[in-house]
Amino acid sequence: MATDSWALAVDEQEAAVKSMSSLQIKEEKVKADTNGVIKTSTTAEKTEEEEKEDRAAQSLLNKLIRSNLVDNTNQVEVLQRDPSSPLYSVKSFEELRLKPQLLQGVYAMGFNRPSKIQENALPMMLAEPPQNLIAQSQSGTGKTAAFVLAMLSRVEPADRYPQCLCLSPTYELALQTGKVIEQMGKFHPELKLAYAVRGNKLERGQKVSEQIVIGTPGTVLDWCSKLKFIDPKKIKVFVLDEADVMIATQGHQDQSIRIQRMLPRNCQMLLFSATFEDSVWKFAQKVVPDPNIIKLKREEETLDTIKQYYVLCNNREEKFQALCNLYGAITIAQAMIFCHTRKTASWLAAELSKEGHQVALLSGEMMVEQRAAVIERFREGKEKVLVTTNVCARGIDVEQVSVVINFDLPVDKDGNPDNETYLHRIGRTGRFGKRGLAVNMVDSKHSMNILNRIQEHFNKKIERLDTDDLDEIEKIAN
């Protein structure tokens, strides 16, 4: 299946989609009537479990819809544990001196040269003696294949006991990584993989003979300590994948730390996360001693190729009218429209359909595979407008989006501007050197305040646009 790695056959993708139908997205619990005006109640806040499932499901969705590697323009920043040691990067897999069966496996996956993150990460991960690594890496950058390569490089196939341990936040994400291991290791028939996930029962007293174990923290901890199916002292490589998803569940964080403490001192520790908020950093530093660090440089996240505007309105009907005026005046190839709640998203999609637009709706209650199908249709241009809530659209890349509309401005759970989400939303439009257009709908003093704070944060002026003035709208399209 397409993990965040290589172009694989479409039928494999479809098979994986079918196998994933059990994972559902939880309903957004935070409601807002107008931009950023949030009403919470004791029952309206997301539980940690729901938040984690949102992130885990989002990550899974990215894997299902990813057909190739993302061309990441961010500069990679490398912080070495030992600054005096030479810094290597590679431009080909041959330079890594892999075992022939492993190189064969890499090429069989359709991978011809390392991605940007792999160029820097692989020499560190394959170094002798082994080095620890904390890496920031988005979906689609080839990090799964990178750590699978590291695990397969260190395994002794003749030794029939677990030597590599990989933690994933959910059963479904563990399966995705497992598929990459099976594909890359297919010319190593003696290499075996075990899944340490709930429901996979072994007899008491039994020992795991597979060399690689991938699983969720709770089950892996049981297998290592209580049930003693695995001897943690023999583990050579420990991978903690999707750390930001993992720590959204308190239990997973504690379990991961307990597993790490059972491992030998010379075990190689590799941790990956798409984001590095403070909580992720603290966790990473607890589980990965003396690490090399690979980060994406923040200043690369530029808004220079995107023209940003705001429109003043009094209510959602006026916002809708402004939207119609935009559509009437300029040619929009494809647009993404973000709403704060599912209710608003559903209403807006229905209104746009009545106006004759081909509209796709990404909604929180959809199964992951349904959402993957909606995104594919939008990618193929079958629908020209995608209306979505924030929860659904994190991390989804569609190259031909020319306009992003914030029907509601992004705010965090406390009602403050969510700058990272703003950047992420509008960053979909100014890609690959093209000019993009972002339009923000403002309908209250509060949302004007949010907009002003977003301007200050990015140090970029957002111009006012009068959508009743056709000449003015036509100017912004040029």
Curated annotation (Swiss-Prot):
Which annotated residues bind ATP? 118, 137-144, 428, 431
Q: Which domain of life is it from?
A: Eukaryota
Q: What is this protein called?
A: ATP-dependent RNA helicase DDX19A
Which family does the record assign?
A: Belongs to the DEAD box helicase family. DDX19/DBP5 subfamily.
Q: Which reaction(s) are listed as its catalytic activity? A: ATP + H2O = ADP + phosphate + H(+)
Localisation: Cytoplasm; Nucleus, Nucleoplasm
Q: A Gene Ontology molecular-function term?
A: ATP hydrolysis activity
The record's annotation in InterPro entries points to:
DEAD/DEAH_box_helicase_dom (IPR011545), Helicase_ATP-bd (IPR014001), Helicase_C-like (IPR001650), P-loop_NTPase (IPR027417), RNA_helicase_DEAD_Q_motif (IPR014014)
Cited Pfam families: DEAD, Helicase_C
Q: Which organism is it from?
A: Mus musculus (Mouse)
- Annotated gene: Ddx19a
Please verify whether the record's keywords include Hydrolase.
Answer: yes
